Amino acid sequence: MAAGDYRSEVVPHEERPDQEPKGQDTVVVDHELENGRRLYRPTRWQSNLTILSCYIANFSDGFQNSLANPTNVIFKQLLGPSGYPSEMQTRISNALLIGAILGVVALGYISDMTSRRAGLLFTSGLVTIATLMSALALQVHPSHNMLWYFVIVRGICGFGVGGEYPPSAAAGIEESDDFKRRYRGPIFVSFTTLMATSAAPIQMIVYLVCLKASNNNLPVTFHAIYSIATILPAIILVLRFFMTDSTLFHYSNFKRQKKSPRFYWLLVRKYWPRLFTTSLAFFLYDFINFPNSIMSSSIISSLVKDHNIQTTAIWQVILAALPVPGVLVGAWLTNAIGRRYTGLVGFAGYVVLGFIIGGTFSKLSQHMAAFVVLYGLLQAFGHLGPGATIGLISTESFPTAMRGMGYSVATAFGRTGAAVGTQCFTPLQEAAGKSATFYLAGGVAVLGMIVYWFLPESGDLNLEEDDRALEEYLAQNGFSMERKA
């Protein structure tokens, strides 16, 4: 079967014995059923392939993001503090983030105006090439040139990683809605936050195994972890040649839409409250989550008494694994209490633990196990709440035709928050001590709770009804959407 094939079948409205009421499991394209036309429906294996590729892709993206921790340790050991100053460490960390911001914005638009599949093929190819270039960084001399080369290629990789988010999130939520509507929230969390979070401890285990196998040979370890990181997007690239766009996107998109400045203004005018609140919530969460994740290696390394690189890596594995149960609880809570309240619970835990760790840091840092457990619980609450729900809310809050763009704007603000937070946390830590960063995280989490209160409860939204509402709104304002047969 060709990559773009789909199953065509006539499904009369009155002859479907298994049809469920709206809002349940089965997606029904109303206008097609009423007219007795042939339905566009991706085959089950194509839908499953799309979701599978989203699982692997988000794992790959999490693997890419978590590479910052071992990279910082390796470069600091190889080059020393003078050869790898804090400002260069910040540049390398921010390169992936800034690239991600540009990629998110560009691919959010492209995936809505062309297709999810085209955007995903491009991003997978770009991440593969850029990661391979990163693996060759230690061959560049002198070290100053090598660091700048690494900044550039990580920025390119970041463009691909960031560009992955809008089409992947949109395609995943649409296929989940096709498959099991009432479970689309937990399914979405499982292939986004759970995969990205699980990638961190697995990446650290790979790093630790490479250290052991090479007898602490850091250049060999560096090449090994980046080579493995190259394989993942290459596999995804192959899988995505066989995927196709979802039913929702097939019937509701802007491919043939006449787009003037007024057209975009109409979209902003209708959806600006959702756009503003999701973007602000994303900004606040990433402002504290990314710096805390990236800086964990430096904090733990400074607390290990003999500065042994393997001991540091073992503690990092434990710390990286602790948030995973939080994601599982968050996935369950998205349906149990709703997306919004799940986010509030997570931010509340972040507030409490942030201030506890900050207030007891001087004594806590003398007991590594206690520190790692509390630090891990802090991260677990973050991943349970906003980590599990902000991407889900941002994806569900916009109709299909502009889902990529809406999600991309919110995510771009999130990545901007991550870049700003990374830029702020390192100088703050150097000026006021490590405890100050936890106080800041707790304070920002309070703001996050306030913003979350105003977010829509996106689990109650019917994606098809939102699509029809957008079509009617545009028609009333002189823009009739041309629907594909």
Indicate residue ranges for each PLM-predicted region:
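Transmembrane-helix signature of 12-pass secondary carriers
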Residues: 2-485
